[in-house]
């Protein structure tokens, strides 16, 4: 059994900014500059669909696996010596279109998670194929579960059944529902006894929808460790595993959690 208290601290950077609508190259240039401002960190988190904005034009915008954004992320991760993650529109090997989070490591390996819950109010379920499985990544011994935007509303999918240390959400969450974002994120940390980090965008997209940001990091009691508000920029925070280990030892509610199976 691993000793969570002995894990090193984890320094993460949240990149909250505007997105150029359907302009991959402009977004590459913008994010390359912002990633350079993060300094020495372990993990850099970008918004959902960070190369295009939240778009249903998957037919024209989807890029292949190992396409330009895979290559760009590999280069940026190597340059920053950090994991870089965010979601993009991908055409999978089976031809389906996915809202796919890419997890680019500095050694060149890329892992991924496909968004499970597609936002039907925008017709996302008509243009994309949902993911079939939960995913957990490891970084410096930390167990990290990635999720994308609308996934936040479904607590069973976020449920920590694998001793997750950090729930990581990347999003294009509109300002009209910012109250829900700010209420649900601390709930996920409290119910799962883990840290939560969430990145949203700011500005207005090509369809006229406004985004309020509110990127944030919360601890296992739902307490705020970082809040970006509506600002555009790069925000860093250090997570301490020893604090999480101590809290779980004092309040092991996870031992009484109900068992379940996902179908």
State the predicted function of each range:
Residues 1-43:
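N-terminal glycine-/serine-/threonine-rich phosphate-binding loop
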Residues 2-12, 136-145, 166:
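Beta-strand-turn-beta hairpins that frame and shape the catalytic cleft
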Residues 24, 32-109, 174-188, 194:
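Cys-nucleophile CN-hydrolase/nitrilase-fold catalytic domain and related Cys-dependent amidase chemistry
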Residues 44-45, 143-148, 168-170, 197:
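Short hydrophobic-aromatic micro-motifs
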Residues 52, 102, 113-119, 216, ...:
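Short beta->alpha transition motifs characteristic of CBS
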Residues 68-85, 153-235:
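CN hydrolase (nitrilase-like) catalytic-core segments centered on the catalytic cysteine
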Residues 86-88, 100-103, 135-137, 215-217, ...:
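Short beta-strand scaffold segments in enzyme catalytic cores
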Residues 92-162, 176-183, 246-253, 263:
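Active-site catalytic loop in hydrolytic enzyme cores
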């Amino acid at each position: 059994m691993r000793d969570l208290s002995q894990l090193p601290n984890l320094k993460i950077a949240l990149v909250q900014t505007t997105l150029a609508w359907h302009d991959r190259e402009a977004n590459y240039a913008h994010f390359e500059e912002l990633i350079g401002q993060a300094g020495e960190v372990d993990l850099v988190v970008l918004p959902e669909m960070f190369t295009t904005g939240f778009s249903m034009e998957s037919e024209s915008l989807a890029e292949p696996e190992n396409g330009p954004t895979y290559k760009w992320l590999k280069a940026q991760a190597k340059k920053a010596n950090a994991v870089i993650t965010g979601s993009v529109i991908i055409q999978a090997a089976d031809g389906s279109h996915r809202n796919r989070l890419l997890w680019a490591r500095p050694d060149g390996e890329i892992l991924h998670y496909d968004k499970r819950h597609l936002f039907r109010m925008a017709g996302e379920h008509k243009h994309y194929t949902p993911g079939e499985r939960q995913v957990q990544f490891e970084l410096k011994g930390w167990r990290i579960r990635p999720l994308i935007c609308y996934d936040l509303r479904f607590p069973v999918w976020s449920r920590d059944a694998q001793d997750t240390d950090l729930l990581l959400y990347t999003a294009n969450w509109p300002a009209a529902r910012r109250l829900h974002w700010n209420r649900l994120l601390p709930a996920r940390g409290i119910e799962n006894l883990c840290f939560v980090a969430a990145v949203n965008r700011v500005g207005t997209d090509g369809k006229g929808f406004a985004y309020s940001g509110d990127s944030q990091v919360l601890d296992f009691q739902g307490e705020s460790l970082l809040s970006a508000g509506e600002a555009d920029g790069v925000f860093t925070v250090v997570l301490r595993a020893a604090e999480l280990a101590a809290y779980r030892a004092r309040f092991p509610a996870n031992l009484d959690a109900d068992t379940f199976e996902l179908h």
